């Protein structure tokens, strides 16, 4: 596993769980609003996998889970083997994904190696390439959504609401696409760290009022629907 970041404790990233977080290096997207630029480009200092596993071993009974984020964790060839090691230590695993590897995601779910999946739905279908900075196979995105809704033990979908790239109508389109999903988060755009595209560095986030107005329009499509990051 190419691990480029590690946080020993988080109360926010795994719902109702005190977790540690690792960031895997590399991503097949170049989302202009991404704030993990070093991780995505593989420029972060790599951490030994055994160091993470040793920490988890020592923190048994104190930590309640591990979040594997990135980058795109499912790019890692040994993600399955790593998840197996973490599960053997007794930890629930949350994986963040962009949805471009539905087969690998299903394998992890079928092998009971993931307990919570968070998938970023970047845009409505017609804007996906623009929001990801890459040519995207929408079939794979759709397949991942299908797998998560049908098979994931627990899950959330989420969209970062980027001013100038997405507006309320786009979020409504995403909500229609995900209709019936258990949980959705509308995430506030943040530019307090270097972004993939410097063009967004001085873009102001949408107001709390506009986020809540958008939230009220999409609530009927989800069992649970929230704003995050305001």
What are these regions, as identified by a protein language model?
Residues 26, 35-38, 90, 113:
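Conserved functional loop/turn residues at catalytic and ligand-binding sites
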Residues 38-44, 65-68, 72:
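Glycine-rich phosphate-binding "P-loop"
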Residues 53-65, 74-214:
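Conserved AdoMet/S-adenosylmethionine-binding subsite of the radical SAM
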Residues 1-23, 30-41, 54, 58-62, ...:
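N-terminal [4Fe-4S]-dependent radical SAM core
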Residues 23, 69, 185:
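Conserved Rossmann-like nucleotide-binding pocket used by diverse enzymes
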Residues 39, 71, 122, 189, ...:
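Flexible loop residues that form catalytic
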Residues 45-55:
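Glycine-rich, highly charged phosphate/nucleotide-binding loops
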């Amino acid at each position: 596993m190419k691990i480029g970041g590690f946080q020993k404790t988080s109360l926010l990233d795994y719902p109702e769980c005190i977790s540690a977080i690792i960031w895997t290096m590399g991503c097949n997207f170049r989302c202009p609003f991404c704030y993990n630029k070093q991780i995505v480009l593989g420029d972060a200092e790599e951490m030994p996998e055994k160091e993470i596993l040793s920490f988890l071993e020592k923190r048994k009974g104190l930590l309640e889970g591990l979040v594997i984020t990135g980058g795109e964790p499912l790019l890692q060839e040994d993600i399955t083997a790593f998840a197996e090691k973490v599960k053997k230590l007794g930890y629930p695993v949350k994986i963040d994904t962009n949805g471009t590897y539905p087969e690998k995601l299903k394998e992890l779910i079928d092998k009971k190696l993931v307990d919570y999946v968070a998938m970023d739905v970047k845009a409505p279908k017609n804007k996906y390439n623009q929001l990801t900075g890459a040519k995207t196979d929408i079939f794979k995105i759709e397949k991942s959504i299908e797998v998560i809704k049908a098979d994931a033990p627990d899950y959330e979908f989420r969209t970062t609401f980027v001013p100038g790239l997405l507006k309320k109508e786009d979020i409504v389109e995403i909500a229609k696409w995900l209709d019936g999903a258990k949980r959705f988060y509308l995430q506030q755009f943040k530019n307090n760290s270097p972004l993939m595209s410097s063009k967004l560095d001085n873009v102001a986030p949408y107001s709390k009022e506009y986020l809540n107005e958008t939230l009220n329009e999409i609530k009927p499509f989800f069992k649970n629907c929230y704003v995050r990051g305001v």
